[in-house]
A protein has these predicted regions:
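Terminal substrate-recognition subdomain of acyl/acetyltransferases
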Residues: 2-22, 173, 182-196
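A short beta-loop-alpha structural element at the N-terminal edge
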Residues: 26-41
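A short gly/proline-enriched turn/hairpin at secondary-structure junctions
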Residues: 50-61
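Acetyl-CoA-dependent GNAT
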Residues: 60-120, 193-195
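Conserved beta-strand segments that form the floor/walls of ligand-binding pockets within enzyme
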Residues: 86, 98, 112-116, 125, ...
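Conserved acetyl-CoA-binding loop-helix of GNAT-fold acetyltransferases
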Residues: 115-117, 123-138, 159-164
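Conserved GNAT acetyl-CoA-binding A-motif
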Residues: 131, 138-150
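Conserved catalytic-core motifs of GNAT/GCN5-like acyltransferases
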Residues: 146-151, 163-183
Length: 196
């Protein structure tokens, strides 16, 4: 008996245009190698504006120093077990969202999702749109039964989005992140059980 492999799936998301409630046109698509510079700058911009992300701008410096590393990562993401979407407004990358599936026999029914939206584009519906698309992709991926995420417990915008999509709290992570000033942020784990 042959086990399912995610390599059997096309992990590329073809570009789709959406119109938000405010009339803004947003294109969702998989990133291309040519997006590397703009994508890394979007990630650094978000990491600079919030403490809610695991990463800091300095964590991405090696990509800035050698953009070919980011280009290679983008190419790798197309063949790995998951999806990576970017949201573009007039060709500007304003958000990115990743959905990765676990690979081991005992946990391949699980996926993990993360999102980063540029501050001035938050609360417009882009996160909701990206999560809707990722949930559809996960639902249509054979064997995937649940999507998980971690969130800082006082990230009200994030919690509102995740709960609206059906994610439920499953645990607490004390001192999940430690900031430069020595203070800690506590985290929550959440899961969405997919109805297939």
């Amino acid at each position: 008996m042959r086990l399912f492999s995610y390599n059997d799936c096309n992990m590329i998301y073809e570009a789709k245009e959406f119109v938000l409630n405010n009339g803004l046109k947003v294109v969702l698509r998989s990133p291309e190698k040519e997006d590397a510079y703009n994508l890394i700058n979007q990630i650094i911009s978000v990491a600079s504006s919030t403490d809610y992300l695991l990463s800091t701008p300095s964590d991405f410096q090696h990509y800035v120093d050698d953009i070919s590393k980011e280009e290679a990562f983008i190419e790798w993401s197309k063949t790995d077990s998951g999806y990576w979407l970017i949201a573009c407004v007039e060709d500007k990358i304003v958000a990115n969202c990743s959905l990765r599936f676990y690979k081991h026999e005992k946990d391949r029914h699980r996926g993990t999702i993360g999102i980063a939206i540029t501050e001035e584009y938050q609360s417009m519906g882009i996160g909701s749109l990206m999560f809707d698309e990722m949930i559809k992709l996960a639902t249509n991926t054979p064997g995937v039964e649940q999507i998980e995420l971690d969130v800082i417990d006082n990230n009200e915008k994030g919690l509102r989005l995740y709960k609206s999509k059906g994610f439920v709290e499953t645990g607490k992570i004390p001192h999940q992140l430690k900031l430069k000033d020595g203070t800690y942020l506590n985290g929550l784990t959440m899961v969405l059980f997919l109805n297939k």
